[in-house]
Amino acid sequence: MTLQECYTKMGADYAPVLQRLGSERIVTKFALRFLEDKTFSGLCDALDAHDAEEAFRMAHTLKGICLNLGFEPLRQASSELTEELRGRDLSVDYADAFQAVKTRYQQTVSAIRGIAG
């Protein structure tokens, strides 16, 4: 799978990312590093531990990473979760927003694994 096909599979637009980062090699490097990133697992751990501050921080960090890498569907889902958690109150119903992040994360990782080899 090509890098452009990877972005298409995840529902993202490759061209702006390539333009912003400057080369396919750099985009590939950072996309593959995303597979090792612990932000999503940190989000899951924080929610399991009922740590609202850390959950917000992890959701916000994930949103930023996805913005930089052009992983738009996951960025949008993590942005919605970030807003749900902004008040640092886990009594709000964030389950649907978290499920959307989880689904988009799995789709994104699956697409990236297609270029990993």
Where are these regions (language model features)?
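Long, amphipathic alpha-helical coiled-coil segments characteristic
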Residues: 11-61, 91-116
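Short, well-ordered alpha-helical segments
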Residues: 39, 51, 55-58, 66-86
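Intrinsically disordered or compositionally simple regulatory linkers and C-terminal tails
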Residues: 1-5
